[in-house]
């Protein structure tokens, strides 16, 4: 158990020091096979992905390294532009229904 916790703490820091963003670290980091197979490290109440983001925020704060985070569009402006780009609200709603029917829950969100 201790080895797993140490790995999940140290590896994000190693990748942060290489300049990776939280999203990049989440995609790159995975437990080694010997830790993944441990019943004591099963992901019930949290995941390595959650932990990576928490560790990043704990050490470096809210800024992810993405310049778009410094002064983002407000949510209404961003939503309208995305809707326009997609061809309007009807197209977005159709995609929402399709994704929901396909159990693509993360995409629906």
Feature-to-residue mapping (PLM):
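Accessory terminal helices/loops
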Residues: 1-109
């Amino acid at each position: 158990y201790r080895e797993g916790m140490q790995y999940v703490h140290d590896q994000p820091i190693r990748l942060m020091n290489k300049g990776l963003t939280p999203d990049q670290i989440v995609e790159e980091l995975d437990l080694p096979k010997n830790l993944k197979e441990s019943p004591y490290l099963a992901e019930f109440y949290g995941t390595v992905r959650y932990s990576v983001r928490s560790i990043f925020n704990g050490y470096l704060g809210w800024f992810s390294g993405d310049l778009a985070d410094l002064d983002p569009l407000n949510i209404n402006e961003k939503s309208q532009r995305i809707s326009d780009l997609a061809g309007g609200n009807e197209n977005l709603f159709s995609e929402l229904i399709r994704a929901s029917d396909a159990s693509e829950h993360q995409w629906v969100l």
